[in-house]
């Protein structure tokens, strides 16, 4: 039982049928036009095989999204919609055989954004914020004297009055680079491609930074709007252990109709996802 409708900003709800089928939606109240809502309303079959992206999420979240009826807030889907459009434009510029490759293996499904059979390169597109981009790139900084020669007028955190002002100089530290679950996701796509007899020499994530150019992004060392970062290879044994365990946990919960344990700290982004971003947080017994 996937999502069944939308939430208005005031909190009341309307079903997909009433909103999109019968056109009873108050567009001005919703603040989002029908064409965008139609994209947000697309659903997958609840009895489908687990997908790579689904297994990256917490098992409890995946279980509730399959078994409970819930309404979605279009405002929380804004960046997801932008990401979908971003993917679609890039896919339209790739050949049919290289873009949106559908894969299946060990009863887990996945869709690869781009596989270049000539260069044997796998690309995954991400529309992300500067915070995540800085983590992926391993951005760090050191302080140096302001090249303008400016000095502090008052003593403070960075220096005493009369001493040269300090400015941040950012650099990439490969040892600090952290792709998080992206590395697991993209490596699983690699494994699935290789299972078809094809080779993958390198993997990259191409990040389009949503807040690129803003002060917040520059304060994290993110100066560009698009970055290409190489994804390190994860050993297949570790990869399969992770995904098989997550697959079995979800399927067992669905079969027994038992709500899984609370998603772990990494899956909930330290609890932030439970507070603001999970579609089924209001249905979760652990929140």
Listing of model-derived features with the role each one plays in the protein:
Residues 10, 15-19, 25, 146-169, ...:
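Metal-dependent nuclease catalytic regions and adjoining charged, substrate-binding loops involved
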Residues 1-122, 127-164, 180, 194, ...:
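Metal-dependent nuclease catalytic cores that hydrolyze phosphodiester bonds in DNA/RNA
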């Amino acid at each position: 039982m996937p999502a069944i409708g939308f939430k208005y900003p005031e909190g009341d709800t309307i079903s997909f049928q009433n909103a999109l089928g019968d056109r009873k939606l108050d567009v001005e109240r919703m603040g989002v036009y029908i064409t965008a809502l139609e994209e947000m309303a697309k659903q997958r079959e609840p009895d489908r095989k687990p997908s790579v992206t689904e297994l990256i999420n917490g098992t409890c979240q995946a279980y509730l999204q399959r078994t409970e009826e819930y309404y979605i807030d279009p405002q929380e889907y804004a960046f997801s919609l932008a990401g979908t459009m971003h993917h679609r434009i890039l896919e339209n510029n790739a050949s049919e055989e290289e873009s949106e490759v559908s894969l299946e293996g060990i009863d887990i499904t996945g869709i690869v954004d781009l596989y270049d059979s000539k260069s044997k390169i796998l690309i995954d597109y991400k529309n992300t914020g500067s915070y995540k981009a800085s983590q992926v790139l391993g951005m760090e900084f050191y302080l140096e004297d302001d090249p303008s020669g400016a000095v502090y007028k008052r003593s403070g955190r960075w220096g005493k009055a009369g001493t040269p002002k300090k400015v941040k100089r950012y650099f990439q530290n490969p040892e600090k680079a952290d792709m998080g679950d992206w590395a697991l996701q993209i490596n699983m796509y690699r494994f699935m491609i290789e299972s078809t007899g094809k080779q993958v020499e390198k993997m990259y994530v191409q990040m389009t930074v949503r807040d690129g150019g803003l002060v917040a992004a520059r304060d994290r060392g993110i100066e560009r709007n698009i970055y290409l970062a190489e994804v390190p290879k994860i050993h297949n044994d570790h990869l399969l252990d992770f995904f098989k365990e997550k697959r079995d946990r979800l399927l067992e919960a669905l079969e027994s109709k038992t709500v899984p344990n609370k998603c772990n700290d990494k899956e909930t982004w330290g609890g932030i996802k439970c507070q603001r971003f999970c579609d089924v947080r209001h249905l979760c017994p652990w929140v």
